[in-house]
């Protein structure tokens, strides 16, 4: 019984820590965010949906990838994409999370082995209020919000999909590239 109490206390402590990290409570709103830490915090928060049959495959670049951003907003991006992937797989399957550097950007790739997104639907997934979920199960705002947040951070998002392999790729400028651009003579002249 004592062991069970200790384990439960540890899990609660981990969840509280993850919630504080997820919301960036007690932190400045804009900061250099470690993308892998951000993804891991989101996965911890979503563990209740993942533990029912979703296997998470991680492939993270070893070098920290920092993005100057509103951290809680990026967590919302990961939440929306991961939640949709879990729903697409009906709660059972493989979720793949990958990070890598591409020139001056970090790329986050989130994929699943669900049924895929038909082309006629894929053309509309980023539109506000577009949903394929039943009434009461979705608002159709998740991917619209995701797109707006990514664009706010001067990034890009793309999706490729076929049965068994749907991938969302998010490109975000690395923190050092953002600093260089912000300090460039052309940007200073506009200010």
Language-model features and meaning:
Residues 142, 146:
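Short alpha-helical Gxxx[C/S/T] motif in the catalytic ATP-binding
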Residues 117-129:
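Short conserved segment of the HATPase_c
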Residues 149-151:
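Detector for a conserved hydrophobic position within an alpha-helical segment of the HATPase_c
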